[in-house]
Amino acid sequence: MDKKQLLRNLPKIDELLKEEIINRYLQENSRTLVVDSLRESIDHYRGEILKNNIDSFTKENVVNYFIDTLEENKSTKFKKVINATGVVIHTNLGRSLLAKEAIENVVKVSENYSNLEYDLKEGKRGSRYSHVEELIKKVTGAEAAMVVNNNAAAVMLALNTLCEEREAIVSRGQLVEIGGSFRVPDVMKFSRAHLVEVGTTNRTHLYDYENNINENTGVLLKVHTSNFKIMGFTEEVSSEEMVQLGEKYKLPVMEDIGSGTLVDFSKYGFTYEPTVQSSLEKGVDVVTFSGDKMLGGPQAGIIVGKKKYIDKMKKNQLTRALRIDKMTLAALEGTLKCYIDEKEAIENIPTLNMILSSKDIHKKRAQRLKRRLQNNVKDFNFKVSEDLSMVGGGSMPGERIPTYVVKVNSDKITAEKIEEKLRLSKNPIIVRVSKDEVILDVRTLFERDFNIIVEEFKKLLK
């Protein structure tokens, strides 16, 4: 059939609205939604005809496409996905998962009025920071604390407060890109601090900082390179040395820890990562870090340190533009409460639990998932193998966590096609692919995910 005839055969919306099946959908959905979905279906087939991609179609084809389109239009764009990649803090999949306590706190505060900026004792306006400041001070040992909407904002606010139109001295090897093309030099530029690079990419000495101090110096800045490692012939100035230099010249020392861990992971067999507490104990004046990375909470930028500096930041006009909302505060409060007892934090904060859970636990879980798949899904091969998970989120670069995975392949469908179908399924499942095998890392899976995975695998060859 020629192209013109195919185009003439496209059904009209009014014609389709008379179909019994469409009428059923009209009874359950708004007319606008149904008509828009019908229009999308007709437009789809018109486009396929014009591209010469089809040489025939039926009204039933158009209706079936409409049904899929309607369901897609009804569903939310922000979806739950199942993370089978083994990357714990997966930036593209939302980073850290919240603890149950944090979720309950968010629900309570979001469905009711709250004392967000109301002092119940005094009966007058209060500060939104008061809800978490005492908790942050308790778990970090800081004199004072405040929270903004992300760590880039925390760095910008701190620099703007400490050295607007003055110089911030930083090692050239610490001018990191923190993801999404956001770079420390760019954040500094918008803070109106003047960047002074010292040292080289791999080696920076104390005298590099001292030789560049002048009457216009505002801060000595240290940035933890949490998302990469420089190996070999390297040298960097310790926090203790920078604090001594700052005291000598009466300059504040600021450290951006980035991933912001409150747990010393070296106690559990990992490479040492500086903790917020250790930086403060060494005398660093201002420390900034993220809430949704190693802390395991919501997206937030947390600033801790000397009270005289934090108080100035609270009064900075930028603070209102960068402040966090009540739901983030509620989630952060629920997360921080877990840290009063480290054992409780590891048990209840999903990020910590996933990172620190032993591979033996995951071996048993991988075997359970394999059995369920084998018992319910035909034409696929399943095997349990040792593998390595990642922390992710620009944290612990180079660190790999021993784990167990389920590897999947089939003679009837390629691994790439399996990955695509799982990703586009009603319950999106994100996997890894290696050597024509699909890899399901159980470290980042919950038991509740297993049944969903089995059901989606059943549909792959249909």
UniProtKB/Swiss-Prot annotation:
Main enzyme class: transferase
Principal cellular location given in the protein's record: cytoplasm
Cellular component GO terms, alphabetical: cytoplasm
Keywords: Cytoplasm, Protein biosynthesis, Pyridoxal phosphate, Selenium, Transferase
EC number, as in UniProt: 2.9.1.1
GO function terms (MF aspect): L-seryl-tRNA(Sec) selenium transferase activity
A Pfam match: Se-cys_synth_N
Gene3D superfamilies noted in UniProt: 3.90.1150.180, Type I PLP-dependent aspartate aminotransferase-like (Major domain)
SUPFAM superfamilies the UniProt entry points to: PLP-dependent transferases
Record pathway: Aminoacyl-tRNA biosynthesis; selenocysteinyl-tRNA(Sec) biosynthesis; selenocysteinyl-tRNA(Sec) from L-seryl-tRNA(Sec) (bacterial route): step 1/1
Catalytic activity, as annotated: L-seryl-tRNA(Sec) + selenophosphate + H(+) = L-selenocysteinyl-tRNA(Sec) + phosphate
Any GO BP annotation: conversion of seryl-tRNAsec to selenocys-tRNAsec
Superkingdom, taxonomy of origin: Bacteria
Subcellular location(s) per record: Cytoplasm
InterPro entries tied to this protein: PyrdxlP-dep_Trfase, PyrdxlP-dep_Trfase_major, SelA-like, SelA_trans, SelA_trans_N_dom
Co-factor requirement: pyridoxal 5'-phosphate
Positions carrying N6-(pyridoxal phosphate)lysine: 293
Family the UniProt entry places it in: Belongs to the SelA family.
Physiological role: Converts seryl-tRNA(Sec) to selenocysteinyl-tRNA(Sec) required for selenoprotein biosynthesis.
Protein name as catalogued: L-seryl-tRNA(Sec) selenium transferase
